[in-house]
Amino acid sequence: MVNLLAIETSGAICSVGLCVDGNRFVRSEHVEKKHNERLLPMLEALREEAGLSRPALLEVLDSVAFGRGPGSFTGVRIAAAAAQAVALAAGANIVRVSSSEALSLAASRQLIDADGVISAIRSRRDLYYLAAYERTSDGVQRCEQLSLIHI
């Protein structure tokens, strides 16, 4: 089993997740543009909820994942910097995850009868990133390129 820390800050919601020995811990907050203020306290709260000391958390982590967008460029940089810092301290792998693919995968697991999913991620004001995914035996696969559209 992989012990994983996940960080997503590319949108208005700041999310962190930790999976250690099959136990899952998750925190999400609607923070708009305060990711830089909330991310580290959320990571600390997650670590405490998991009952791990700081050194113990760094010892058990195999990988650190972060949402690489699309979304806020500053938000992606915050997640990437935090993931890089934790992974470096833990000697863990860094994994970049497409935010639209992760969203589509989660939606496809809830929509049992759907053959595909379209993800829409707000960029700013009336601009949205859209991507179409089809369901596969092991998840989802993008079938239409990511597009930025005005709504």
Predicted regions span which residues?
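Short coil/turn connectors at secondary-structure junctions
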Residues: M1-V2, A12-I13, L61, A90-A92, ...
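Phosphate-handling active-site elements
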Residues: L52-L58, A87-S98, I112
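Surface "functional belts" at beta-alpha junctions
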Residues: G22, S28-K34, N93-I149
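DPxDG-like acidic metal-binding loop motif
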Residues: G67-R96
